[in-house]
Amino acid sequence: MLSDREVLSTLEMLKNEHLDVRTVTLGVSLFDCAGHDPEKFKENVQRKIFRLAGNLVKVCDEIGIRYGIPVVNKRVAVSPIAVAACSFSRPQMVEVARKLDETAADIGIDFIGGFGALVEKGFTEGDRALIAAIPEALASTRRVCSSVNVASTRAGINMDAVYLMGKTIKDAAELTREADGIACAKLCVFANIPEDVPFMAGAYLGVGEPDSVINVGVSGPGVVKKAIDRARAANPHLDLGALSDIIKRTSFKVTRVGELIGRQVAEKLGVPFGVVDLSLAPTPNVGDSVGEIFQSLGLQSIGVPGTTAALALLNDAVKKGGAFASSYVGGLSGAFIPVSEDLNIAAAASRGYLSMEKLEAMTSVCSVGLDMVALAGDTSAETLAGIIADEMAIGVINKKTTAARLIPVPGKKAGEKASFGGLLGEAVIIAVSSNFGSREFISLGGRIPAPIHSLIN
């Protein structure tokens, strides 16, 4: 039986604490669209996305109005294009990206993900063509997002792919020089990428997924912060164990909301419901910040000593509460630390509290730590590859998802600001300890073997 206080607290979440469903993402398999004729492939892709996702925005809006819970982003994730369009050349891959962008605009969605490849153990010709197409594809489209998986606990780290992605990021930044390298904001490099991520830029539909499926990403950092603030105001002597329990209970409510909306949308569209991703996703709006949660837990700012421990507490409590609320939890399900997309985190970086090394340390206990990190425009491809390799190693050794979304901002140096607009926000450019110290190591290439604990059979 719900108490009056619980009902009122849920209403307060909706009214004043920015509770919403951050994204409803429809996965669409493109494998039945495959063929050797690029024009026919593009036609098949457009027709299938229209058929399955044509009413996605309308249905999400209707369900949101019915329950008073806004769905902020409506998105589509498709099969990895490097697989579905494996016989195509680089220019043909670019044309596929443009068709995806056109289709996304026609149906009114925010982003379309899946322009990516899975290369943790090596490349096919389709993989090489797609990765070569990424800079032009992202620079010439608005809604297309790309993700490339270069490592896994079972395969190790493909260092040739890591180096190639360092070069790709540089090229993508240069092609969008006038917009602070914004193409890189739509490109994510992964280790252990899940097949059901609803969040961009990592979303794609895995090969083991249904023909179509709804996956939901919840929100709620503002809700968690307010819950902690209320509890500490009522009882200043609460310890971290008690605060963890409060976060857990709040996460339960947030996840219940996400699953309710997701299932209603799936039923209305006539497709299966997949998972709820439990990641707390911030925005650049006041009161919707993951960074502010750390201050509510007693830290002066995110980035000071104790930050990684606080993040571990937060991540664990959110997972425990969310897992109890939903039978199907998936995606990344770990706190995001997107530097430019969170006002508080961006401010901490500009004040010097957040270094590259601290962000990397935080990644060991969350899913995406080097996220929307702006770097100096002269950062070399080898240095980018070294940063990516470090991030991949954390994921591979700890059997978890990690990712890097790095933005070398052309023409700007550490300490200057980069602005990406909208949900992508703005951030100070973070310094890197050395720009050329990784060159020899990265140029060796090859594959770093999988760790011994990958042998689990």
Swiss-Prot record:
SUPFAM superfamilies: PFL-like glycyl radical enzymes (SSF51998). Pfam families: DUF711. Coiled coil: none annotated. InterPro entries: UPF0210. Homodimer. Belongs to the UPF0210 family. This is UPF0210 protein Sfum_2948. It comes from Syntrophobacter fumaroxidans (strain DSM 10017 / MPOB).
